[in-house]
Amino acid sequence: ASYGITKGLSLQGDMETIFCMPKPSGEEEKFLKIIGMNQVPIVWRDINYDYLKSRLLEMSPEEYYSFRDHIYADFSYMHVNDLGCMEFAGGYPGNLHEEINNFSIIAGVVARQQEFDIIHAHDWLTYPAGVHAKMVSGKPLCIHVHATDFDRSRGKVNPTVYSIEKNGMDHADCIMCVSELTRRTVINEYHQDPRKVFAMHNAVYPLSQELLDIPRPEHPKEKVVTFLGRITMQKGPEYFVEAAALVLQRTRNIRFVMAGSGDMLNAMINLVAERGIADRFHFPGFMKGKQVYEVYKNSDVFVMPSVSEPFGIAPLEAMQCGTPS
């Protein structure tokens, strides 16, 4: 969703987007300015220019020095590398809340150094950073709610996560929700003023010719049914496995694919083994880029058994590939 939004904004012509991400890989498209938060110093270090050039990925030494001049507090007690920067594990590490706090600290440096008109923070992981940037700059904060903890936890809300979500919403000038369902949740469960909460539906970016030209393999003797997404509680992966077990009691000429990663992956592998359907089940792992559309094209049916889905993009992607959802 963030890719589509930033790509669309970049085509407006009169708008510049600065994308702050914890840990750039270097493979990102260059249609916008990327700031790797793991390259923004929070502790002053006297670093040689040539050494900086060899170490920095998405940042020039000049920009590093400018960020260094905007360090606003003594963070020498924090764990930093030789550049005075904090490292990020990426994904959902065990110290996730620590990384959220670290991201917020760095946002304070960025907000003091960059010039911008509005702050756009996506989901609870970046709300503290957005709030900090607003407090530093005085610029309006728009938060984008892709899901709430009521969706992710099946109603068993984590009080810490809820507190972070509500604090972000309380400080936001505008709250964008991916669906009317999410908007109602924000208003009713987080007690937000309806006048600042808007439904802004997701969409898919038109496919390139390269993706449209991906061939659809023929497998006339069997059908392929696919689950593609995060293998987490919210997405209901166990329902996909249980449904597959029921179908395979009727016919064996179907293969089931569960593509993705998540904290329930190992449990699903074990459940497939317990149901005795491992010979009909495939776990290809996390898919990205072209691989996603190759999976869709290789499927006869796409299934999304989510328990709570604010607005699922995956069915639209499958439909783009001509795969029933």
What are these regions (language model features)?
Residues 12, 18-111:
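A conserved catalytic-core segment of Leloir-type glycosyltransferases
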Residues 99-106, 139-142, 150-167, 206:
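Nucleotide-sugar donor phosphate/pyrophosphate-binding loop at the beta->alpha transition
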Residues 176, 218-244:
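Conserved donor-binding/catalytic core segment of Leloir-type glycosyltransferases
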Residues 181, 203:
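Carbohydrate-associated surface elements
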Residues 267-287:
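Nucleotide-activated donor-binding/catalytic signature segment of Leloir-type glycosyltransferases, i.e.
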Residues 286-287, 294-299:
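Short alpha-helical donor nucleotide-sugar binding micro-motif in glycosyltransferases
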Residues 307:
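Aromatic "clamp/platform" in nucleotide-sugar-dependent glycosyltransferases that forms part
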Residues 312-315:
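Short glycine/serine-rich donor-binding loops of glycosyltransferases
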